[in-house]
Amino acid sequence: MKKKIILSSLTLAGLRWLAISDYFFKYAMTTYKKKPESKELSGRDALYRDKLGFKEFEKQEWILRVDSNISLYANYLDNHSKKTTILLHGFMSDGDSMAGFAKMFYDLGYNVLLPDARAHGRSSGEYIGYGWVEKDDILRWIKKAIGYTGDDTQIVVMGQSMGGATAMMVSGLKLPKQVKAFIEDCGYSSIANRFFNPA
């Protein structure tokens, strides 16, 4: 009888652990697809004017085919410039969430590329890499931007949160000479910091 109680308790504890582990894995690692915006922009938003201005920009849709299963999407704002900024969004967001920065850089004379990270927004992919897989995707976007604007272009990469961590990972790669600067806004230094010390 005592063995049955202990065995039942251990089995129940194991099943609970599996259920909790499954929940957190799905939350942390699986795809995030933004639902269409149903509410209007609020005038109380600090970046209201910039976001409103961003909505009025003519955007090109760029697509990168990484392999047979992965297609990455981005919006590109062509400012007919030799300066380009690539803006990297955070976890559970998409490229358009960087609209305030996009308007600012556009007004400063930059072309602006706003990619949706793998498994975010319109981009496909099943799992989120928290910057590790995405760093290679951003290198592909950099090369595509150079191909579009020419070898004499200058590129700035800016990321926020997960995008900031991705930007710092990209900065450690062998990069084309056209990449001139990185801006990192509140990225994390490790996955543990991302989950256990959120901003």
Language model segments and positions:
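The serine-hydrolase catalytic nucleophile loop
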Residues: G90-M104
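An N-terminal hydrophobic leader/cap segment in hydrolases
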Residues: K4-L64
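Alpha/beta-hydrolase active-site loop
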Residues: I128-T149
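Hydrolase active-site cap/lid region
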Residues: M169-A199
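A short loop-to-beta-strand scaffold at the N-terminal edge of the catalytic core in hydrolase folds
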Residues: E61, D67-L77
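Conserved alpha/beta-hydrolase
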Residues: A102-S124
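Short beta-strand element of the alpha/beta-hydrolase
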Residues: K82-G90
